[in-house]
Design a protein with these regions (language model features):
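A penicillin-recognizing enzyme superfamily signal
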Residues: 4-7, 33, 55-58, 109-286
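Extended, hydrophobic alpha-helical segments in both membrane/secreted and soluble proteins
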Residues: 1, 6, 10-11, 19, ...
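Short, glycine/proline-biased beta-turn/loop segments that scaffold the active-site neighborhood
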Residues: 1-50, 129-144
């Protein structure tokens, strides 16, 4: 869970739909790297730039998240371990494959229930609770005893870290975010993220409030092969057989269909319930821990290095 404050910036390589950024094996460490060049595209052309985590999350800049992983040391396996603790795994139940594309950008097979459960860990301030498909069983008019629903819940992520991630994930639903049109009714606090696979054959929106986490997947089955690409979509209300009165879309993204469906589900489910705010993260998460830098002026090289080491720094001589 080590990382950068939410106010930090990361370096994002220039990238776009037709000019992907290239990453090589030398940029990653550990066993979850790449064996050949990995090409990463953003949905729109962007230059080499330093971009804040707030902007990168709100605008869904793929190369910024790769840049963040590299700034964290380039060991994607550590990121995968955190995902596993949060309840994120493949549809088979196994860990996410050991490749940066799967770990950092989500290019793998997972179920909506799994992703909603992982986001629930954030909504619950770092405490993971496994999904419970059966809430009660009634036999002959009597409810049978079931294990306490909260008995399997356990802390998987530091509460302050979870609050910091939630702070970032509120960006996509705000003005300028990828899903700014899907904010919840009445300004109810919510956090979430859009997701779009190559070719738009799968699009997602996963989001949550302090009470509820919901994942929406819009896609087509694997066995349709080339027909999986979701384009030129015509939407119409139930009962209508002609026309596209609910919208026509040439290209589909996570914000196009999945996010509005998510909003409709959340608004209806939470209607009439109190609007609960998210807890704010502390300054150590938003701004980083402040430490005093020792005065090493007029010190010998050895003395200066010793003072910096004593203060917790790792000195480097250039």
């Amino acid at each position: 869970e080590g990382g950068w404050p939410t106010s930090s910036s990361v370096f994002a390589k220039a990238s776009g739909p037709s000019n992907p950024a290239e990453y090589t094996s030398k940029e990653f460490t550990g066993e979850c790297g790449v064996s050949k060049p990995w090409y990463v595209r953003n949905d729109y052309n962007s230059p080499d730039e330093e971009i804040t985590l707030v902007e990168a999350t709100a605008q869904s800049i793929n190369t910024a998240f790769v840049g963040l992983a590299l700034q964290l040391g380039g060991d994607a396996c550590k990121i995968r371990d955190t995902e596993w603790r949060m309840g994120l795994h493949q549809a088979s139940g196994k860990k996410i494959p050991p490749y940066p594309a799967a770990i950092i950008l989500g290019a793998t097979s997972v179920s909506p229930m799994t992703v909603a459960s992982a986001y629930q860990t954030l909504a619950n301030e770092g405490v993971y609770c496994p999904p419970v498909p059966v809430l009660s069983i009634v036999k002959d008019g009597k409810a049978l005893a079931l294990p306490a629903l909260g008995s399997a819940c356990e802390r998987r992520v530091d509460a302050e870290v979870a609050r910091g991630v939630t702070r970032l994930l509120q960006g996509p639903l705000r003005s300028g975010g990828t899903a700014s049109g899907s904010g919840l009714a009445g300004g109810r606090p919510a956090a979430g993220k859009t997701g779009t696979a190559d070719g738009s054959n799968e699009t997602w929106f996963v989001g949550y409030t302090p009470e509820l986490s919901t994942a929406v997947w819009v896609g087509t089955p694997n066995d349709l092969r080339n027909e999986r690409v979701v384009r030129n979509i015509c939407l119409r209300p139930a009962g209508e057989t002609k026309g596209c009165s609910a919208g026509r879309y040439g290209s589909v993204f996570g914000a196009t269909i999945a996010a509005p469906i998510w909003k409709a589900i959340m608004d209806r489910t939470l209607e009439g319930t109190p609007k609960t705010p998210f807890a704010d993260p502390g300054s150590a998460i938003t701004d980083g821990e402040k430490v005093d830098i020792p005065d090493i002026s007029r010190r010998s090289l050895d003395d200066a290095k010793a003072l910096l080491l004593q203060a917790g720094f790792v000195p480097s001589v250039v």
